[in-house]
UniProtKB/Swiss-Prot annotation:
Motif ('HIGH' region): 41-50
Positions occupied by motif 'KMSKS' region: 231-235
Keywords, in A-Z order: Aminoacyl-tRNA synthetase, ATP-binding, Cytoplasm, Ligase, Nucleotide-binding, Protein biosynthesis, RNA-binding
Catalytic activities: tRNA(Tyr) + L-tyrosine + ATP = L-tyrosyl-tRNA(Tyr) + AMP + diphosphate + H(+)
Annotated localization: Cytoplasm
Name of the protein in question: Tyrosine--tRNA ligase
Highest classification ranks of the organism: Bacteria, Bacillati, Bacillota, Bacilli, Bacillales
Subunit field text: Homodimer.
Binding residues for ATP: 234
GO BP terms: tyrosyl-tRNA aminoacylation
Amino acid sequence: MTNVLIEDLKWRGLIYQQTDEQGIEDLLNKEQVTLYCGADPTADSLHIGHLLPFLTLRRFQEHGHRPIVLIGGGTGMIGDPSGKSEERVLQTEEQVDKNIEGISKQIHNIFEFGTDHGAVLVNNRDWLGQISLISFLRDYGKHVGVNYMLGKDSIQSRLEHGISYTEFTYTILQAIDFGHLNRELNCKIQVGGSDQWGNITSGIELMRRMYGQTDAYGLTIPLVTKSDGKKFGKSESGAVWLDAEKTSPYEFYQFWINQSDEDVIKFLKYFTFLGKEEIDRLEQSKNEAPHLREAQKTLAEEVTKFIHGEDALNDAIRISQALFSGDLKSLSAKELKDGFKDVPQVTLSNDTTNIVEVLIETGISPSKRQAREDVNNGAIYINGERQQDVNYALAPEDKIDGEFTIIRRGKKKYFMVNYQ
């Protein structure tokens, strides 16, 4: 008997590997299943690289199953070697605690809590911190063969360049997590990225050896790739964070709206809860009227609203429209800084005020002759307003918050002028 959720995950391309495809399907058809996904607190915010595993877990919740979200307060003190070419820098306990605080708030925005299938948030330091070294070696290490661990991709890929015993034992700690959640909270499925396959299967194997447990399964989702070969999850400014202080909702919105025609339908399937009928319609729109970018706008709206809420989405759309139309005066200083974060930053002394000299000193125009031509031809805009007077002097009101001025040359070349 097929399972509606599994069929949906397959259609979305969200299933990479399963330890027992039929076993998982039978289990989901039989009962409300408790399953988990985890993340180590390596920073004080999640980034969009974390989104897909957690959104996949949320899809299970939408179908009546109960998600456990594990934050690795214990494993985060060690460091996961999976997908890393070199040793991680160990974090202090204080830093890990600070990171957990930030991530926990974001988890509450992604999942529903307080219902009969409400999410459960756990920290693995609560049980890993209680295990003594002797207990770790006798009760757990005895059941894990070194040859078995050496066969894991996450270990093999590091042997040539070296791996510490600390990171070598990481997979055992994550295996202990699955066993603990299985016995204490009846958790039967672990969900993770494709790089977590070795850690997931280690947990199932440890349960089998320790408890004779067979009712435990693993499901991984694919690595998110872009059609141009670039790494997903990075903008020109770096990582795209879920924390609005690190990546503003406007920047977040812009990241999604700028996805290519080649990637947008896949990302609609991955990152939104829109159904097949609507996504098929958006695909048709993309094919027939790509200039409208309806699919990209929908992707940006759906993901931004889910993570930041409707008010933040409306602000992001308003900022985008104002920047597109050149109506900069309708925006606050913070909104302008967010909007022009990636444009060239130039510095100007407070003594320079003549528009031609400003253009030369900042390098916006390459020569005095060109600067005068740019102004005379109406190619220069100060904070969105055209300036055609070569004798114009920048006034205090041209400095937004007394800090910066936005100068545009031509149709699309923006510069943020900062003062010293």
